[in-house]
Amino acid sequence: MMKANFIVVEGLEGAGKSTAIKTVLDTLKQAGIENIVNTREPGGTPLAEKMRALVKEEHEGEELKDMTELLLLYAARVQLVENVIKPALANGQWVVGDRHDLSSQAYQGGGRQIDASLMKNLRDTTLGDFKPAFTLYMDIDPRIGLERARGRGELDRIEKMDISFFERTRERYLEIANADPSIVVINAEQSIEEVSRDIQDALNEWLSRQ
């Protein structure tokens, strides 16, 4: 019997993460894995959701500094990992996450251009060697992704960043993904059917090796 694993879906705004997560859940269930916990970052616990709101919302009269944003994200992540993800895995439940640490490495390390050694030290200090077993990165041109995101309604504080921010974020995502065999890059600019097929193929191939 396969041990419970932590699977994450990553991507820029408008990359289709919600649809990808549904495909992941369906594929796992088809493989006989029914006991699954869903998480999202930032958030996923009552306290972490409050931190999510602080990161996402505009703060009239006060700028949220990049370092404050980064520390809030890691504080929320620790709450989620320690209070939800690790207990679920220990209980034999699979966990499917909407974002995890790779988001911070890409958005704050790449987009915000925060020092790489600081990013690594913060990750190592807060998470240790904890990481997802398998990650699907939904890759999309930021212009296409933001167009899709705008179609959903009002943009949040981070979604309002300029295009160069998202280009740097995407570049960092791809840089990390290309160096880590546990991360699979999915072309999210394809049709929903093609994207779903690629996700199913990648996930089933990974499951066959567990």
From Swiss-Prot:
Q: Name one GO cellular component term.
A: cytosol
Give the residue range of the signal peptide.
none
Q: Which reaction does it catalyse?
A: dTMP + ATP = dTDP + ADP
A GO term, aspect molecular function: ATP binding
- Listed CDD domains: TMPK (cd01672)
Q: Write down the EC number.
A: 2.7.4.9
Name the residues that bind ATP. 11-18
Query: What are its GO biological-process terms?
Result: dTDP biosynthetic process; dTTP biosynthetic process; dUDP biosynthetic process
**Record key words, sorted:** ATP-binding, Kinase, Nucleotide biosynthesis, Nucleotide-binding, Transferase
Q: Which InterPro entries match?
A: P-loop_NTPase, Thymidylate_kin-like_dom, Thymidylate_kin_CS, Thymidylate_kinase
Family annotation (Gene3D superfamilies): P-loop containing nucleotide triphosphate hydrolases (3.40.50.300)
A Pfam family per the record? Thymidylate_kin
Report whether Nucleotide-binding shows up as a keyword of the record. Answer: yes
Which family does the similarity line name?
A: Belongs to the thymidylate kinase family.
Function recorded in the entry: Phosphorylation of dTMP to form dTDP in both de novo and salvage pathways of dTTP synthesis.
| The protein's name in its UniProt record | Thymidylate kinase
Q: What is the lineage of its organism?
A: Bacteria, Pseudomonadati, Pseudomonadota, Gammaproteobacteria, Vibrionales
